[in-house]
């Protein structure tokens, strides 16, 4: 099987075929750092992390780029409202740069606790103004812009494909326009590439440009920075569904308006995290941050586990009851995994934990010898290759740890491979469970059943299976002694 992803552009599942064989260029919209990320925002970054981990595990050389918006994002995506950074700075009595630095650190503190791998390239908008200006010049040279009221606008009527991503056309946009009117715009859905002081007198960060001293519109930064680090055509662009209608639609128009080439091959979007009152929203004041979750007695990994239980393209309802279920589910999972660790030395356990960082599809297949273990592993990979189906993948994980006749080393190798993608620190957290309990309680009936199965295997001269059962019991902390045709057991 091969990796298939649901492409928003075309609204169908497609086989992933990279531009350059064996490589994957991935761009994701990062946070606007004017406040803490709420847990709905963080769902996007867990999804992006799962995507990147899956690509890497499948053997792709991934270049992962994410922006940090620290200038130019208004409270409404359609160029209206206040500047989010300026508003936050004024409310808190800080400078815009102080606000950006504080909330950028807070964001990465949250992602670290969620075991989200930091993208290889993190780029700030304020550090790429020259790239934005140069890209705007190309867009202007191709006849897609006009000046009005001191600002440079993108004229969407010059780009016939406008709205294709969101499956809307220009006539629908005109008929359904319900946004704040900007009298400078020829079309309500035209958007600003470069603001001057005509928009905000109090803008804290401004730069010289061919169109006057000012600052960039929000959309241009993603086009400019993705092209700098990934080239003019990229494999995958990811983000939340709230970006489809405006931000990502505008990114396509300006990128392809500059280059004349298709910009992104695969668009991936995750659904909202919702509460009983609707979607989580900072502007509406209805949001929860990760610190709130932790202060309620949950861990960040409990929240990650909750997210894995839902497909990224399905809405997921958040509640404290759901968090309690996720917490108990992860606890039970760790207890079961800990049973497979019992009997190993600390160094042996840490070797398996280290495998999580080092395995890929090929190396894992080479290491997994047992047929049942291989089957669980293959089914897990099939689930992830089917548009990142984490609910199905978790089901395969649960089936694996319930098996009783797979050698310990194969189970732990498969667990390490699975966790290379899931990122819930299975072996490390289960090791902590083992240390906290001193030893895992052993089900005596299970031991006796395995001893009987081993005896039957020996009678059938299936010595390989008999040895595997002995090894499994040893992994559970049980030593067998064969004397005078009778087998006894004791704890290590």
UniProtKB/Swiss-Prot annotation:
Q: Which organism is it from?
A: Treponema denticola (strain ATCC 35405 / DSM 14222 / CIP 103919 / JCM 8153 / KCTC 15104)
A GO cellular-component term linked to this record: cytosol
PANTHER family (alphabetical): CYSTEINE--TRNA LIGASE, CYTOPLASMIC, CYSTEINYL-TRNA SYNTHETASE
Q: Which gene encodes it?
A: cysS
Name the domain of life: Bacteria
* Compartment(s): Cytoplasm
Lineage of source species: Bacteria, Pseudomonadati, Spirochaetota, Spirochaetia, Spirochaetales
- Motif 'HIGH' region: where in chain: 31-41
* Subunit-level organization: Monomer.
Its cofactor is: Zn(2+)
Which residues does the annotation say bind Zn(2+)?
29, 222, 247, 251
Q: How is the cofactor bound?
A: Binds 1 zinc ion per subunit.
Q: What Pfam families does the record point to?
A: tRNA-synt_1e
Q: Recorded E.C. number(s)? A: 6.1.1.16
Q: What is this protein called?
A: Cysteine--tRNA ligase
Record carries keyword Plastid: no
Catalyzed reactions: tRNA(Cys) + L-cysteine + ATP = L-cysteinyl-tRNA(Cys) + AMP + diphosphate
Q: Name the UniProt key words of this record, in alphabetical order.
A: Aminoacyl-tRNA synthetase, ATP-binding, Cytoplasm, Ligase, Metal-binding, Nucleotide-binding, Protein biosynthesis, Zinc
State the InterPro entries in the record: Cys-tRNA-ligase (IPR015803), Cys-tRNA-synt_Ia_DALR (IPR015273), Cys-tRNA/MSH_ligase (IPR024909), Rossmann-like_a/b/a_fold (IPR014729), tRNA-synt_1_cat_dom (IPR032678), tRNAsynth_Ia_anticodon-bd (IPR009080)
């Amino acid at each position: 099987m091969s990796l298939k992803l649901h492409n928003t552009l075309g609204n169908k599942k497609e086989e992933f075929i990279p531009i350059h064989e064996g490589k994957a260029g991935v761009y994701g919209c990062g946070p606007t750092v004017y406040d803490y990320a709420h847990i709905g925002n963080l769902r996007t970054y867990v999804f992006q992390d799962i995507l990147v981990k899956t690509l890497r595990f499948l053997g792709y050389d991934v270049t992962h780029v994410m922006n940090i918006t620290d200038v130019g994002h208004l409270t409404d995506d359609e160029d209206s409202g206040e500047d989010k950074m300026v508003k936050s700075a004024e409310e808190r009595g800080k400078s815009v740069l102080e606000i950006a630095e504080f909330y950028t650190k807070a964001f990465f503190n949250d992602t670290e606790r969620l075991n989200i791998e930091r993208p290889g390239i993190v780029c700030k908008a304020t550090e790429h103004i020259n790239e934005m200006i140069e890209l705007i010049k190309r867009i202007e040279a191709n006849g897609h812009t006009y000046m009005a009221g001191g600002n440079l606008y993108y004229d969407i009527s010059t780009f016939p494909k406008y709205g294709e991503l969101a499956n809307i056309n220009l006539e629908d946009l005109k008929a359904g326009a319900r946004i704040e009117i900007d009298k400078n715009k020829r079309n309500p859905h035209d958007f600003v590439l470069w603001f001057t002081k005509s928009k905000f007198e109090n803008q804290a960060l401004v730069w010289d440009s061919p169109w006057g001293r000012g600052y960039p519109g929000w959309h241009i930064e993603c086009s400019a920075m993705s092209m700098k680090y990934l080239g003019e055509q990229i494999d995958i662009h990811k983000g939340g569904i709230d970006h489809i209608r405006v931000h990502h639609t505008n990114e396509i128009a300006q990128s392809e308006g500059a280059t004349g080439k298709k910009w992104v091959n695969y668009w991936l979007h995750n659904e909202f995290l919702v509460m009983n009152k609707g979607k989580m929203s900072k502007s509406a004041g209805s949001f929860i941050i990760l610190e709130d979750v932790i202060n309620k007695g949950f861990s960040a990994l409990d929240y990650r586990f909750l997210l894995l239980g839902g497909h990224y393209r399905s809405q997921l309802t958040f509640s404290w009851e759901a968090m309690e279920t996720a917490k108990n589910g992860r606890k039970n999972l760790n207890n079961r995994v800990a049973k497979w660790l019992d009997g190993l030395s600390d160094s042996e356990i840490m070797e398996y934990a280290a495998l999580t960082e080092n395995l890929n599809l090929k190396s894992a297949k080479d290491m997994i010898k047992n047929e049942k273990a291989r089957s669980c592993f293959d089914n897990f990979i099939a689930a992830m290759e089917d548009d990142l189906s984490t609910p199905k993948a978790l089901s395969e994980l649960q089936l694996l740890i319930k098996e009783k006749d797979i050698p310990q080393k194969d189970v732990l190798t498969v667990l390490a491979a699975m966790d290379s993608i899931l990122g819930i620190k299975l072996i490390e957290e289960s090791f902590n469970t083992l240390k906290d309990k001193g030893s895992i309680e052993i089900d005596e009936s299970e031991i006796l059943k395995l001893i009987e199965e081993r005896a039957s295997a020996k009678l059938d001269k299936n010595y390989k299976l008999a040895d595997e059962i002995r090894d499994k019991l040893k992994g559970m902390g049980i030593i067998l002694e064969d004397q005078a045709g009778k087998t006894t057991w004791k704890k290590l």
